[in-house]
Regions:
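Active-site neighborhoods and metal-handling regions in enzymes and metal-associated proteins
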Residues: 1-347
Length: 347
């Protein structure tokens, strides 16, 4: 896009016969350009010529921070900036413009996310039905992946399904489900349009809670419902997170696992021993929407700044909510042996 000239360009190479043999007939570059409202299309090699000319004229070339290594290498070829440092030269103006554009979802986008959530619902209810003693985690994870695939979709991220939920991103599905354990499933679907869903649910193996499991489950459920109750346009998600943490701390205090003044405990971050992550994040074309652009620009702004406090520092979304935002609500309660041992050693 040449902002100064007010012109859009589409670069790409048309397929040759070898491509057609292996991939079948493909739309032309000109047709692809027309689909997105661009009238001028050129072979990909001309992109380097146009960018090089702009640089030679002293014009600023705007690009987003590259996430994939191949794009880093391409930007090095186009701009002459070494791939190892090219991220430092990403355009802050363009980052903020894209964040502003993608943060507020249109009705058609929300419809796509709803459809992805419907697939996610089917995935999670299947996991609940299969959560029985003697079943291998990998089998259930495979069923979930298959459900997403059956809709022409894919999973929105690598499925997390485990009876060792104390590891937050546990992709080890090698265990056999056992009576008395809880199975955590963190999974979602991604539509062909790339819009995503993301749900986290925990259920008892065999369908019956044991000991304090139901008490802890109900605390997390109350946290989830508290976020739904208070989240609205105009309130910061940082404050929603903090209020949810108070519900968690109060519930754990009632169980004898925390003590003292709840407000003071949450302000000090004591609850992070059990909830060492944030409540939620933006969701859209990526499951952690736009995270590659820099979470400080996506989840925060000049008004709400990220915290360095343990637990709260992992909150990806803290800024003031607006109508059209799509945010996840994912509280949890974890008993992480290494973290508990560290806390005991530092008492």
């Amino acid at each position: 896009m040449d902002v100064e000239a007010g012109e859009d360009y589409f670069f790409g190479n048309d397929v040759d016969m070898d491509d057609i043999i292996w991939m079948g007939p493909q739309p032309s570059v000109k047709d692809l350009a027309a689909q997105v409202g661009v009238q001028q299309s050129f072979p990909f090699a001309q992109l380097k010529e146009i960018v090089g000319k702009a640089i030679a004229q002293g014009r600023k070339v705007h690009f987003l921070p590259p996430y994939r290594y191949d794009n880093m290498m391409l930007l090095e070829e186009l701009t002459g900036i070494r791939a190892s440092i090219v991220k430092k030269y990403a355009s802050l103006e363009l980052i903020k413009a894209v964040v502003a554009l993608r943060s507020v979802k249109e009705a058609c986008e929300i419809e796509e996310i709803d459809l992805a959530c419907n697939i996610g619902y089917e995935m999670h209810t299947a996991a609940m039905r299969l959560c029985k003693p003697g079943v291998k985690e990998q089998y259930i994870a495979g069923v979930l992946d298959g459900i997403a695939s059956s809709y022409g979709s894919m999973t929105s991220f690598a499925t997390i399904l485990t009876q060792h939920g104390e590891t937050l991103h546990n992709h080890d599905h090698s265990h056999i489900l056992e009576v008395g354990r809880m199975m955590l499933t963190d999974a979602g679907a991604e539509r062909l349009s790339n819009y995503c869903s993301d749900h986290t649910r925990t259920v008892p193996v065999g369908g019956k809670f044991q000991g304090r499991q139901k008490d802890v489950y109900n605390i997390v459920l109350a946290c989830h419902d508290k976020a739904l109750e208070i989240a609205r346009p105009g309130i910061t998600y940082m404050s929603v997170h903090q209020e949810v943490c108070k519900v968690l701390a109060q519930g754990l205090k009632d169980l004898g696992l925390m003590k003292g003044n709840i407000d003071e405990a949450v302000a000090a971050g004591a609850h992070a021993l059990f909830l060492p992550h944030g409540l939620g994040h933006m969701m859209g074309l990526d499951v952690h929407d736009m995270e590659d652009l820099g979470q400080i620009y996506v989840g925060y702004d000049d008004e709400v700044r990220p915290s360095s406090q343990f637990g709260l520092a992992s909150l990806r979304m803290g800024r003031r909510l607006q109508e059209g935002f799509v945010i996840t609500d994912e509280p949890g309660c974890y008993f992480i042996p290494a973290l508990i041992d560290k806390w005991r050693a530092e008492k």
